[in-house]
């Protein structure tokens, strides 16, 4: 058995229950599960928590649109989240719901404690509020008048509220981050938090709302509900037994958390708000917050309206659980966003799972049966290529240890497949089918098959955290069991004389893309149909195309005011994301004989690659201004629906660059 290395408490972000999670959301639970299984193999006593975030204005509005109570709505969505988490074989130890009675009771106590000690005070809030992000913003923080995080419209908000004294703890948090370099990972996330939020100065945080009711009431002032982020973040301590009046032994054992695994879009809440709340509660901070990248559909944001959303259950139906796990783990870089398309999934399935792994196991077991009746024996008759194979196999564990210590999961799984590739090369080098023709080479053939069987056993054991079902199927075919982690750098432990299965199972049969495509088309058509139904429900029975959006009229302008604005057709020559912003793109736009640099808040709906070559409508004489530190010399015109989806205004007919819009 691996040496007991102590506790390892890890969490995912709890999933927001506004709808069914797609594969981009599901990526996090698969990633977390791989880490949890790996840590267990290493010898840690892992406690792995996940769950659902179930309060907030957005959920109340969704429930009203569905004509059911908020609790009925979150019960349905939370059940769907848990079903999908179970479907992808996640081995969590605890599934928390923020509507759980014990959580709500503890949140009330936490709020009261912070109020009693002077960290929370009563005041009034006036500013802008983003409902999808559940975030408050000042006018100066908005980008193009919209939420700087998601790019959607914000609404004026003025209400009595309770506030948390964030500024009181800011210097202490800055010192902590500077003296704990592993606290925020990757480093780019740390730099973003320091430069964009902490160093410019923190404002006190609104921690209650009165404009909606779906939340945890403030115990001593029940017309207020607790701000969703104070409610949601505390799940990491409430569910394991924290109590301001006296915590449980489980809490004392598990806290502080060793890892909070979250999406990069909520790093601010977990590395600024959460540690400051903990400081106020006089609790130690988590050891690490890791903000993973996003998984994008073909480089684009997933959207039902486009029919391009990929759900985990659809992937599992078409390819199986472990193929789904393999794709999202293998394709996600350490820091940058990954890309998923149906074509890429099929390509990886055939090249990696069917060819490299499945073919290797099948050939090895089949040759053992064909040449030795399935009995695997080490004869000690070695060849020149054996040493290199053994060196690669026995070194793989330590290479994986190095990668997993930095949470480079994609790199770790690549190391396992490098082992399998080396095994395939070993078959080509030793040519067992040639050895089998020479009776004098029988002992050498036996040794070759022993080396392959031992190598595959080690590889399967290393593969287990990532593809658990496949790893177990492999060792069953080899009539052995998964190897202990401490033994995975040793070669020759496969029991001599073991008989492998006489009926090898095809682990991954190659897929014909032509057979899959009709199923993909049906999935996409269904999504568009569901989207249209949702839009009709939201728009009072009208389709999305028929719907009318009412907006508040702005102050009238004169014709002279209008003629001051110059609109022309522009052609986008190049485009790139703005480094300091999650929503901005910077485009070089050719307008007649000139080229202007224009910064636009359209990143959530367009990738830089999509922008290049588009003909767009441009306000060309807008006074230049800097957005996120980048000069912008005009404005691209867009339409926006009530869901915040942006669509660039483009000429209906072909028009030359520079054509006047009148």
Where are these regions (language model features)?
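Structured secondary-structure scaffolds
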Residues: 2-50, 102-106, 150, 156-370, ...
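N-terminal catalytic cores of NTP/NDP-binding nucleotidyl/phosphoryl-transfer enzymes
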Residues: 2-77, 94-111, 116, 133, ...
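A glycine-rich helix N-cap at a beta->alpha junction
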Residues: 78-91
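Intrinsic disorder at enzyme termini
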Residues: 474-561
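Phosphate-backbone binding interfaces of nucleic-acid-interacting proteins
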Residues: 541-662
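Secondary-structure transition/capping motifs at alpha-helix termini
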Residues: 1-4, 38-45, 66, 70, ...
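Cys/His-rich short segments
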Residues: 117-170, 174
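Helix-rich, typically C-terminal accessory recognition domains appended to large enzymatic cores
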Residues: 122, 331, 343-382, 392-500, ...
């Amino acid at each position: 058995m691996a040496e007991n290395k102590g506790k390892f408490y890890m969490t995912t972000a709890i999933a927001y229950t506004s709808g069914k999670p797609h594969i981009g959301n599901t990526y996090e639970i698969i990633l977390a599960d791989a880490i949890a299984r790996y840590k267990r193999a290493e010898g840690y006593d892992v406690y792995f928590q996940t769950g659902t975030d179930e309060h907030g204005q957005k959920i109340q509005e969704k429930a009203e649109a569905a004509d059911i109570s908020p609790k009925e709505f979150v019960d349905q969505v939370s059940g769907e989240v848990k079903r999908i988490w179970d479907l992808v074989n996640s081995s969590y130890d605890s599934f928390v719901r923020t509507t759980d009675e014990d959580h709500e009771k503890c949140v009330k106590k936490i709020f009261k404690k912070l109020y009693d000690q002077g960290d929370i005070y009563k005041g009034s809030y006036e500013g802008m509020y983003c409902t999808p992000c559940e975030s408050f913003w000042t006018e100066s923080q908005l980008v193009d008048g919209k939420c700087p995080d998601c790019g959607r419209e914000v609404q004026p908000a003025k209400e009595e509220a309770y506030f948390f004294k964030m500024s009181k703890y800011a210097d202490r948090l800055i010192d902590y981050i500077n003296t704990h370099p592993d606290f925020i990972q990757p480093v780019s996330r740390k730099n973003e938090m320091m430069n964009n939020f902490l160093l410019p100065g923190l404002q006190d945080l609104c921690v209650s709302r009165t404009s909606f009711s779906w939340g945890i009431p403030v115990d001593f002032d029940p017309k207020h509900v607790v701000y969703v982020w104070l409610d949601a973040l505390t799940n990491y301590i409430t569910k394991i037994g924290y109590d301001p009046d006296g915590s449980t032994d489980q809490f004392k054992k598990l806290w502080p958390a060793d890892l909070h695994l979250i999406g990069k879009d909520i790093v601010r809440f977990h590395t600024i708000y959460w540690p400051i709340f903990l400081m106020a509660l006089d609790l130690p901070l988590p050891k690490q917050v890791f903000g993973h990248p996003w998984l994008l559909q073909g480089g684009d944001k997933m959207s039902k309206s486009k029919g391009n959303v990929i759900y985990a259950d659809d992937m599992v139906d078409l390819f199986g659980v472990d193929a789904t796990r393999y794709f999202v783990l293998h394709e996600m870089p350490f820091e940058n966003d990954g890309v998923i398309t149906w074509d890429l999934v099929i390509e990886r399935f055939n090249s990696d799972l069917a060819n490299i792994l499945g073919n290797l196991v099948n050939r090895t077991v089949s040759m053992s049966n064909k040449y030795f009746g399935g009995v695997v024996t080490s004869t000690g008759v070695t060849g020149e290529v054996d040493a290199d194979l053994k060196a690669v196999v026995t070194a793989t564990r330590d290479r994986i240890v190095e990668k997993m210590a930095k949470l480079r999961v994609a790199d770790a799984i690549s190391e396992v497949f490098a082992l399998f590739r080396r095994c395939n090369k070993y078959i080509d080098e030793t040519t067992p089918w040639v050895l089998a023709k020479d009776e004098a080479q029988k002992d050498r053939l036996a040794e070759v098959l022993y080396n392959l069987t031992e190598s595959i056993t080690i590889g399967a054991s290393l593969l287990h955290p990532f593809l658990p079902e496949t790893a177990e199927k492999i060792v069953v075919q080899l009539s052995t069991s998964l190897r202990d982690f401490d033994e995975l750098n040793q070669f020759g432990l496969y029991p001599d004389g073991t008989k492998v299965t006489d009926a090898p199972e095809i682990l991954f049969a190659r897929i014909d893309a032509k057979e899959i495509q009709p199923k993909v088309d049906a999935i996409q058509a269904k999504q568009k149909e569901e989207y249209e139904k949702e839009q009709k429900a939201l728009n009072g029975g009208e389709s999305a195309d028929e719907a009318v959006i009412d907006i508040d009229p702005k102050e009238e302008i004169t014709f002279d005011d209008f003629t001051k604005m110059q609109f022309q057709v522009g052609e986008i020559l190049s485009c790139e994301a703005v480094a300091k912003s999650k929503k901005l793109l910077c485009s070089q736009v050719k307008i007649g004989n000139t080229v202007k640099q224009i910064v636009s808040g359209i990143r959530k709906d367009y990738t830089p690659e999509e922008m290049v070559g588009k003909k767009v409508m441009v306000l060309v004489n807008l006074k230049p201004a800097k957005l996120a530190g980048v000069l912008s010399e005009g404005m691209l015109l867009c339409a926006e629906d009530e869901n915040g989806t942006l669509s660039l205004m483009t000429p209906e007919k072909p028009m030359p660059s520079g054509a006047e819009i009148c």
